[in-house]
C-alpha cells in the first residue's frame, strides 16, 4: 500500500536511489497504490552522472511492497521493502537493468519489458 509521501527504493539503473510518491494515478481521489500501479514520483536521492537528477518528477510503476499481493490460490507474496521502476512519458522503463525480484502481476501488456529485464519473477 503506497500512498502520497511514501518513500520507495528504485529497482533499476536509471541513477535514482530513492523516490517519494507525490500522487497515485488512476482515479480522482485514489489513496493507495499496490504492485503494478503507476504513481507520480519525485527523485529524492540520485547518483552522480545518472540518467535522472534529484528533484525530477517522473512516473513509476510499483514492483515490490511490504504489504504484498494476494494470489488466487490464497498465497501471499511479501517483500522486505517498497520499490519502484522509473518510467518515461511513454511508460517505458528509463533504466536498462532491473534489480531484485518482481511479481507475475506485472505481466500485463504495458510492463512486459520489466518482466523480461528482471532477474527473477515470482
Swiss-Prot record:
Pfam families: Ribosomal_L14. PROSITE patterns: RIBOSOMAL_L14 (PS00049). GO terms for cellular component: cytosolic large ribosomal subunit. The keyword Ribosomal protein applies. The keyword RNA-binding applies. One of its GO terms (biological process) is translation. It comes from the Bacteria. Keywords: Ribonucleoprotein, Ribosomal protein, RNA-binding, rRNA-binding. InterPro entries: Ribosomal_uL14, Ribosomal_uL14_bac-type, Ribosomal_uL14_CS, Ribosomal_uL14_sf. GO terms for molecular function: large ribosomal subunit rRNA binding; structural constituent of ribosome. Part of the 50S ribosomal subunit. Forms a cluster with proteins L3 and L19. In the 70S ribosome, L14 and L19 interact and together make contacts with the 16S rRNA in bridges B5 and B8. PANTHER family: 50S/60S RIBOSOMAL PROTEIN L14/L23, LARGE RIBOSOMAL SUBUNIT PROTEIN UL14M. Binds to 23S rRNA. Forms part of two intersubunit bridges in the 70S ribosome. Belongs to the universal ribosomal protein uL14 family. This is Large ribosomal subunit protein uL14. It comes from Hahella chejuensis (strain KCTC 2396). The lineage of its organism: Bacteria, Pseudomonadati, Pseudomonadota, Gammaproteobacteria, Oceanospirillales.
